[in-house]
UniProtKB/Swiss-Prot annotation:
Fluoride-specific ion channel. Important for reducing fluoride concentration in the cell, thus reducing its toxicity. GO terms for biological process: cellular detoxification of fluoride. Na(+) binds at G75, T78. Disulfide bonds: none annotated. Pfam families: CRCB (PF02537). It comes from Pseudomonas syringae pv. maculicola. This is Fluoride-specific ion channel FluC. One of its GO terms (cellular component) is plasma membrane.
Length: 127
């Protein structure tokens, strides 16, 4: 149990640090729709897709790898709460089209990136 908690904490710390860095660097460039959150969710979706495929193909790996990568790192990197807060702020500002665009981009984009991660692993794995 302690080992599981430790790998989750390490992964979550690294993922949250990367999300913070993306927000600091990218949100200043385009504050209308904070791209740091979008990029964090897209990258996280892609990594989760890759990780799911890789871990499914590697059953001998320790279960802590799943906890480190998916639960920890991707859990710390991706952010539904920040996406929700940013979307509500857009609605409160009366920018409904921006809010709808943000919702579409996050949801469809994250799903597409997860599928792309799965497909990427399948393409690499068949070579």
């Amino acid at each position: 149990m302690l080992k599981s908690l430790l790998v989750i904490a390490i992964g979550a710390s690294l993922g949250a640090w990367l999300r913070w860095l993306l927000g600091m660097k990218l949100n200043a460039l385009f504050p209308t729709i904070p791209p740091g959150t979008v990029v964090a969710n897209m990258v996280g979706g892609y990594i989760i897709g890759l990780a799911i495929a890789f871990l499914a193909a590697s059953p001998s790996l320790s279960p802590e790898w799943r906890l480190l990568i998916i639960t920890g790192f991707c859990g710390g990197l991706t952010t539904f709460s920040t996406f929700s807060a940013e979307t509500v702020a857009l609605i409160q500002e009366g920018r409904l089209l921006w809010a709808l665009g943000s919702i579409s981009l996050h949801v469809v984009g994250s799903l597409a990136m997860t599928a792309a991660g799965l497909l990427s692993y399948q393409m690499i794995g068949t070579r």
